[in-house]
Design a protein with these regions (language model features):
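Ubiquitin-like/PB1-type beta-grasp interaction modules and other compact soluble beta-rich domains
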Residues: 18-226
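Sec-dependent bacterial lipoprotein signal peptides
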Residues: 1-17
Length: 226
């Protein structure tokens, strides 16, 4: 009886393996952008690629480039011959974002579909390993949400009513849903001193190593025209 039971179980396993689960249903088109040096050079630009329930950030890249991986297929090592490397004291690798947010889990486990924007960038991360978001994906993530979370956007007007009104109009015109309650992304608008007084502003003032933001604030030239 034991032998028969094992045989039936094994046969069932072979049948299931033979059938396979397939790629799943279509989930809409995604865009794929592959660049280097923080987007300064475009290598691949595909605005509409078909995706399905098995599509991931890595699989979309693999289907549209010559991809090499490491660490058991979990890490992108090389794209079209451009490989992660160390040169002197500088380190270079591939990073990806979805809808403007740099993902916190591996690309092989990150599902994509339904108008998601997938962006891979090869860059020197020596001075700033943690870059939380990329402005080049705008209006994402404000208009798209992220990782199946449909966030709204709340505007925090620190100062400058005209500037706040302009930002509000711009966001709404770009399809962003503004709301004041629930889980939201916050856009702070104000004079530089007011912005730098916030926790986020204090991180920005510490440089890209602390904030991931490459920006330097300087006093305006008094003699320059407005």
């Amino acid at each position: 009886a034991r032998t028969v039971g094992l045989t039936v179980f094994a046969a069932a396993g072979l049948i299931l393996a033979g059938c396979g689960l397939g790629p799943g249903e279509d989930t809409g088109d995604v865009s794929l952008l592959v660049t280097r040096d923080y987007g300064s050079k475009v290598l691949v630009d595909e605005p509409a690629l078909p995706a399905n329930e098995s599509s991931t950030a890595m699989r979309i890249l693999d289907q549209n480039s010559d991809l090499e991986t490491s660490y058991g297929g979990e890490y992108v090592q090389s794209v079209d011959g451009i490989s992660g490397d160390t040169s002197g004291s500088r380190s270079f690798d591939w990073f990806f974002s979805v809808n403007g947010i740099v993902a916190e889990r591996g690309s092989a486990q990150f599902p994509v579909g339904g108008k998601d924007k997938v962006w891979w960038d090869y860059r020197d991360w020596t001075d700033a390993m943690e870059v939380g978001a990329v402005v080049g994906a705008y209006p994402a993530p404000f208009s798209t949400g992220y990782d199946d979370r449909d966030w709204g956007v709340q505007i925090d007007c620190l100062s400058g009513e005209d500037a706040c009104r302009m930002v509000t109009n711009q966001l709404e015109g770009d399809g962003v849903r503004l709301k004041d309650t629930g889980e939201n992304m916050i856009v702070r608008v104000g004079l530089i001193d007011d912005v730098l007084d916030t926790p986020e502003g204090q991180r920005i003032n510490k440089g890209p190593g602390a904030s991931g933001v490459f920006v330097r604030f300087a006093a305006p030239d008094v003699g320059a025209p407005e």
